[in-house]
From Swiss-Prot:
Protein name: Histone-lysine N-methyltransferase, H3 lysine-4 specific
Major subcellular site: nucleus
Subcellular localization: Nucleus; Chromosome
Biased composition annotated in UniProt, kind: Acidic residues: 730-741
Positions bound to S-adenosyl-L-methionine: Y1194
Protein's GO biological process: methylation
């Protein structure tokens, strides 16, 4: 094409105007290429529309009703044609019938199923009109419509004898598809309201080409190249290829990329070394396994390689296991060889691939070994022998054995045996049912279809119409296995429905359907469930083992803690409980009953009822006496009234709680604890029943010996008794009982010893009576014996000088003594008041009546001194425990108990303060609003509190009056709290007063100073020892010298071995500095903060450690020191080397900076030059033992006139007091 003929569209094919013109031309071509059928349909629609829109009236009908009448007539004519179709069907196929007029009986003009050029005889059946072709109700057809329809039919109908169009061509051109129906007449909406008419429907017909949708963008030329519209997105028919996301273990739930590969294709005889060399070039191998046959040990030519993560691989960066496996897989796909064979590599994520390959290789070797095995001397089976015999039902001919002779056997030479390879049997030996898990299957038992290998292919062909996955068989039958999905289950049911009980050759397939897999299969638990069960099992086993260990430990602990004393204590407690119940019955219940049955209490009642008084009243063996301030009832008041006419009667004026006391020696339960030197009491008479004891009568003239058990006093002195057997109340009770027995027998039998022993009891009671109204009974044996001796002296002096008025006073005293012995501890204070009054009266009478007798005066002085001593002892014992005084005050209201405010309110303090239920209720009321604290077991908490108190205050038991604290540890603050004091620096001298380790050093120092003052000789010896310690660095031991000589010899040998260089000495000295370092550690120091301690024994003059830090100039060191002080760093570690250089180890340094100062140090600091630089090294001044703190002298310049001197805290014997 020349340049002149080329146009704008040729040079610019993508211009918008050119594209628009091409689009217009393509649209016109599509319109021209439309099929002729559309035009024909258009003509038909035009004809029908023209007939419907004509304004003529047929049979008087309006134009609106014309269409409805035409449709009715058309339906009527079609019905008539259908009735006469059988008679006219044979004639309709001839040309004469096609040209017959309307007057004949032909119905060609009304047949609508006549073939057209677009249909054939196979398109659709005849005489099947649609619902829209029903007969009209009136049976008439308009002439105009019949004429038009005839014209249309004549122009469009084609006779049957016309050569038909080929079927394939007509189907490819147009295929009619009925999409649905359209309602054209609805009787419900018609204006005629004629409900007899039926609704009319018209089919909606469309062809395949019209129903097929096409992409309108494809009609645009070069649309895929972006020529349609440059502003729109380019059409991309292929999907995008996205980048593969790398594996991230933090956000990935599933398994990670494979780290194991399996290699095949190499020679099985290839050694493992070349395989390992090849695959180790991709990454670090964790495991390599060349598979072998487990039976024969032959290599299978299958090798699995597993990689692991490596931090550094061949000097490069880290390589992960998955990346190594990936590189090996892609590299080996390019054709890697091992030897002369090309290998094949596959991923093996879980080892399943290698297992499958190994199992296949092993099975193939088994088959090859069976084929290659020669058959020698194998007996023929019975089936082979009888293979050529006729069937058993065949007729038998005459026997010819008698006429047959054995033919001679012709010898044959050796010949090769050509054996066909045995076909592997398709019948599996392993049961298939156990291998099927959840796969749907159909089972055919072997009893219905015999299990043969040849039957399996025929069964597969028989079931080829179904989508099965595999068909397998074993000795039990056939298994038709489908895929494990919903579709597989449906296919299983469909196969069972169509093939169950059907024939397979001559057998019937009796099937058993299992659409949900093996019903007896138990699903293995998931990994999470297995891990959970394993964890639970491990936890249960652990708890069980711990319980068993606890039981064994408890058994061992019980065996160790088994104490016979504990068991004895339990037995004693049980016996005491039983004894207490017996005492309650005998001492409380029985006396209360006797008191209630006393006849005197019911005198008024007897008078009211007219009952006479009993003839005699016997006092029971139990005494229920009452003490009061004015009177003391006594059962033997008749003897006292004879001697005291003015004595008061035994009536109870002020009632109090009774004292219940058994008669003397009625209880023999404690005979084992009595002194064997005492006289044994006589055998008591039998006790009569209670009723007789209450009602028995006695004469006044009966002697006391008949009514009471004979008593005998103990004549042994109390000094002769063992002290351990004298109780706190035994003496007073014995004295009271002796006095009561003496009064029972006769008042005349009282001698001087008894009277003066009663005076001693009264004096002891006076001593017990404290001004604070709190009593503490003190019955100490030595004091009591001392008082008895004084009473004996008083009796000896004043025996011949007494007058008759003394017995009167003594009777009153005796009356108080008896009351003292018979009354209970609850009213002991009132008894003491009464006895005090009697004692004062007795002393005054003695003073006034016998003032001229020196013996009595002497005894009075002794009594007063003894009373003062007892009062002091009582006051001292009173402080130990405050007891409640349950009685009525006589002179003024007094508190029951006086609380001591100095008692520390810990657990023991609260137990001492709370006396009764009332105090406990008050305490509950106070603590109601306080929040409740959880303390767990109350007994354990109380025991723990008392154990803490015992640790803090050893030896203190019970209430204390001083809190547990360390003297000087808690420093008071002016503002009340350390937080409100603000920030201030605490001096080291103050820290030494309250820090525990400083207090320890301070105490050691004070003890040393006190010892030096008390013993000057030891002080001088200590000073000499300190002086020797200072000079010990000048001399060394023999072993140290030997070690030093050996070290020097080693250094000289190293010098000779090294080449001659100028810096050898510095290098050797630096090596010495590193080699000779001693093991040390830092810990809390008693001198100051942290300290350095030796971990081994260090000899004198040995190097210990180097003082390491940052080397700075003097000006920088001064600036840093000021900065450290401003920032609050209390300790700065600056060590001066020379005038211009300072080592700063405050923030950058070794542990040598923790060495503290001491006025008598065990180390020293030396400056040596190593490698041209000065170093600070710490040496030992003397032999240092293990765990001893290292110290050296800081050697600060002495500042005599300075006000800010640094105190020394070393605490040594030669301490100077200050560092500067």
């Amino acid at each position: 094409m020349s340049r002149s003929s080329a146009g704008f569209a040729d040079f610019f094919p993508t211009a918008p105007s050119v594209i628009q013109q091409k689009r217009y031309q393509a649209t016109r071509e599509r319109q021209r290429s439309r099929p002729h059928l559309s035009r024909e349909h258009a003509d038909e629609e035009q004809i029908v529309t023209g007939s419907r829109t004509s304004g003529e009236t047929v049979n008087g009908n309006s134009p609106q009703n014309l269409g409805q009448e035409l449709r009715s007539d058309l339906n009527k004519s079609r019905k008539e044609v259908a009735e006469d179709g059988s008679a006219s069907h044979g004639e309709a196929n001839t040309p004469a019938n096609n040209t017959s007029g309307p007057g004949t009986g032909s119905s060609n003009d009304t047949r609508l199923d006549t073939l057209t050029p677009l249909t054939n005889t196979e398109s659709s059946p005849q005489n099947n009109p649609s619902p829209s072709q029903a007969k009209a109700p009136n049976g008439d057809e308009p002439d105009g419509f019949r004429q038009a329809r005839a014209n249309v039919s004549n122009s469009t109908m084609t006779p049957l004898h016309t050569p038909p169009t080929p079927t394939t061509h007509s189907l490819s051109q147009r295929v009619a598809i009925v999409k649905g129906s359209k309602l054209v007449h609805d009787p419900d909406r018609a204006p005629s309201k004629d409900k007899r008419k039926r609704p009319c429907y018209v089919d909606i017909v469309s062809d395949e080409q019209e129903g097929r949708l096409s992409d309108p963008r494809l009609s645009i030329q070069n649309y895929t190249r972006g020529a349609g519209c440059r502003q729109k997105t380019k059409y991309r028919p292929a999907p995008y290829v996205l980048r593969h996301w790398p594996y991230d273990p933090a956000s990935t739930v599933g398994p990670g990329p494979p780290v194991q590969i399996v290699v095949t294709g190499f020679d099985p005889l290839t050694p493992l070394a070349p395989i390992s060399t090849l695959f180790s070039s991709f990454g670090e191998i964790a495991e390599i396994n060349n598979r072998t046959d487990p039976d024969t040990g032959r290599f299978l030519g299958i090798c699995s390689v597993k990689y692991k993560d490596s931090a550094s691989f061949h000097g490069s960066g880290p390589v992960s296991a998955s990346l190594a496996a990936k590189n090996a897989f892609h590299e080996c796909k390019k054709g890697q060889r091992i030897g002369n064979n090309r290998i094949k590599v596959e991923y093996d994520r879980d080892g399943q691939t290698s297992e499958k390959l190994a199992s296949r290789a092993i099975a193939a070797q088994r088959i090859d070994s069976k084929i290659d095995m020669p058959v020698v001397g194998e007996p023929k089976s019975e089936a082979q022998v009888n293979k050529n015999e006729p069937p058993p039902t065949a007729p038998k001919g005459p026997s010819g054995r008698s006429f047959m002779r054995p033919s001679a056997v012709i010898p044959e030479g050796p010949r090769a045996s050509f054996q066909k390879p045995a076909i592997p049997s398709l019948i599996e030996e392993t049961p298939i049912l156990n291998q099927i898990k959840r796969d749907p299957y159909i089972f055919i038992a072997h009893c219905y279809v015999p299990v043969l290998s040849s039957t399996l292919p025929h069964l597969k062909k028989r079931l080829k119409a179904f989508n099965w996955k595999d068909i397998r068989c074993d000795r039990t039958g056939y298994y038709i296995i489908f895929e494990n999905s919903r579709r597989g289950e449906e296919e299983t049911e469909r196969c069972y429905k169509f093939c169950h009980m059907k024939l397979l050759f001559t057998y019937i397939m009796n099937m058993e359907s299992q659409p949900y897999g093996n019903p007896h299969y138990e699903r293995s638990p998931s990994p999470e469930r297995m891990k959970q069960e394993q964890r639970q099992k491990a936890e249960t086993e652990r708890l069980k083992k711990e319980a068993e260990l606890d039981i064994e430990e408890e058994k061992k602990q019980r065996a160790l803690d088994l104490d016979p004393c504990t068991e004895v204590l339990a037995i004693v407690i049980k016996d005491l409980r039983d004894k207490l119940l017996e005492d309650v019955k005998s001492r409380i219940a029985a006396p209360a009953l006797y008191d209630y049955l006393d006849p005197e209490r019911h005198a008024s009642r007897r008078k009211q009822l007219g009952i006479p008084d009993p003839e005699g009243i016997k006092r029971p063996m139990f005494r229920l006496d009452f003490d009061s301030r004015d009177s003391t009832p006594d059962p033997h008041a008749k003897f006292l009234n004879k001697r005291h006419p003015s004595g008061v009667s035994g009536l109870n004026i002020l009632s109090a709680l009774p004292r219940i006391r058994k008669a003397h020696r009625l209880d023999r339960t404690d005979v084992a604890f009595l002194d064997e030197r005492r006289k044994q009491p006589l055998r008591r008479r039998n006790v009569r029943p209670l009723y007789h004891r209450l009602q028995q009568l006695h004469d006044a003239e009966d002697s006391d010996e008949e009514q009471h058990t004979p008593l005998s006093r103990d004549t042994d002195d109390q000094d002769s008794r063992p002290p351990s057997r004298i109780g706190s109340e035994t003496e007073s009770e014995d004295a009271d009982e002796d006095a009561a027995e003496a009064l029972d027998n006769s008042t005349e039998r009282l001698d001087n010893e008894d009277r003066h022993s009663e005076i001693g009891d009264l004096e002891a009671a006076v001593q017990d009576y404290s001004p604070s109204r709190k009593r503490k009974r003190t019955s100490e044996s030595p004091s009591h014996r001392k008082k008895q001796k004084e009473s004996d002296d008083f009796s000896a002096v004043g025996e011949g000088t007494r007058t008759d008025d003394i017995p009167q006073v003594l009777d009153g005293v005796h009356k108080g003594t008896v009351s003292q012995g018979l009354s209970d501890s609850a009213d002991e204070s009132s008894r003491l008041d009464h006895n005090k009054v009697l004692l004062e009266e007795l002393v005054e009478d003695i003073k006034t009546t016998h003032s001229e007798e020196p013996g009595i005066k002497t005894h009075h002085v002794q009594v007063r001194q003894s009373a003062e001593n007892m009062v002091e002892g009582a006051e001292y014992g009173e402080a130990a425990r405050h007891e409640v005084e349950w009685r009525v005050s006589n002179d003024e209201p007094r508190p029951i108990v006086d609380d001591d405010d100095s008692v520390v309110m810990d657990l023991d303090g609260w137990q001492d303060v709370v006396k009764d239920e009332e105090d406990l209720q008050f305490l509950r009321n106070i603590l109601e609003k306080q929040p409740m604290s959880v303390i767990g077991n109350l007994s354990a908490w109380a025991w723990r509190q008392k154990e803490i108190k015992a640790l803090n205050r050893p030896g203190d038991v019970g209430p204390t009056r001083q809190a547990a604290s360390i003297e000087g540890y808690y420093v008071p603050n002016i503002t009340g709290a350390a937080r409100t004091e603000g920030r201030k620096r605490i001096l080291e001298s103050e820290k030494s007063k309250y820090l525990p380790h400083r207090i320890k050093v301070q105490k050691a120092r004070e003890e040393r100073e006190a010892k030096a003052k008390s013993d000057p000789q030891n002080a001088a010896a200590e000073a000499a020892r300190i002086a020797a310690a200072k000079t010990i660095s000048k001399s060394t031991s023999r072993s140290t010298r030997v070690n030093n000589r050996r070290l020097i010899a080693d250094i000289n040998a190293q010098k000779q071995a090294l080449p001659s260089q100028g810096g050898d000495s510095d290098v050797l000295r630096f090596n010495q500095l590193k080699k000779r370092k001693k093991p040390v550690r830092f810990a809390r120091s008693a001198i100051h903060n942290w300290g350095l301690y030796a971990e081994v024994n260090i000899s004198a003059n040995e190097m210990i450690i180097e003082y390491v830090g940052e080397k700075v100039r003097q000006q920088v060191a001064d600036m840093r020191e000021r900065r450290y002080l401003k920032s609050g760093i209390g300790s700065s570690y600056l060590f001066r080397i020379d005038e211009n250089t300072v080592i700063d180890a405050t923030k950058r340094g070794g542990i040598a900076r923790f060495i503290n100062h001491s006025c008598t140090p065990n180390c020293t600091a030396k400056i040596i030059k190593v490698d041209g630089s000065k170093r600070i090294v710490i040496y030992a001044l003397r032999d240092i033992e293990r765990d001893e703190e290292l110290t050296y002298d800081y050697k600060f310049e002495r500042e005599w006139d300075s006000d800010d001197r640094i105190p020394c805290l070393c605490g040594s014997a030669g301490c100077k007091g200050f560092l500067n």
